[in-house]
Structures are given as C-alpha cells and as structure tokens.
C-alpha cells in the first residue's frame, strides 16, 4: 500500500511540474516585443550576405574605389579591400544598365583604396 501511495505522490508532483512549466511559457508569450529573447537578438547574424561585384572573365571585380556594398536583408555596409583585390578602373555607366551585355573593361589591382590600372583587359558584364 505504501508503494502505491509513493507512486501516486510522484505522479502528482510530476503533473504539477508540467503544469507550472506550461503556465510560465504562456505567460511569457503575452509579453511585449521589448523583452526579446536571446534567440531573436542573434537571428539577423545568420541571414545570407549579398555583396555587389561586377562580373568578368577574371572573376568578381570591385568598383574603382575598391569598396563593395554588402547587405544581409537587415543592414547595409561597405566592404573595403585596401590592397591586392581585383577591380575595374574604367566605369561606363551606359553599360551598367544592360547587365547581360558583355563589354571590354580595364582591370587593375586595389591599392590604398583606389583601383590602379595594370593595363590589362577582361570581358565584363
């Protein structure tokens, strides 16, 4: 008989524990968005990042100022490559409106925040 009472008591305590946990969760759901959880605070860091390069036969090229605009759907920032990255030194705005048109562009290497032309050419689009 004592064994049955002990099992009954454990079941009642377990049920009370489950009920208190469920009540705490439902109370937290009613809280305003000002009290955001840690999961929501870090959610934006894991979104895909998109950076805007010019396409070419030698790979992605940075603009003449060697700064690429990047976004992850919540924030924008400039990604600057000071030295060593490929860039295009010639900007032709009339060609940028037709993104699928291939044209000959002058390429160079980023140095000190500017594109230094090395007198080589590539097909750009």
UniProtKB/Swiss-Prot annotation:
GO biological process, one term: negative regulation of chemokine activity
InterPro entries, sorted: EVA_Class_A
GO cellular component, one term: extracellular region
Any one Gene Ontology molecular-function term assigned to this protein's record: chemokine binding
Subcellular location: Secreted
Presence of keyword Repressor: no
Coiled coil residues, start to end: none
Pfam families per UniProt: EVA_Class_A
The protein's role, per its UniProt record: Salivary chemokine-binding protein which has chemokine-neutralizing activity and binds to host chemokines CCL1, CCL2, CCL3, CCL3L1, CCL7, CCL8, CCL11, CCL12, CCL13, CCL14, CCL15, CCL16, CCL18 and CCL23. Binds to CCL8 with 1:1 stoichiometry and disrupts CCL8 homodimer formation.
Name of this protein: Evasin P672
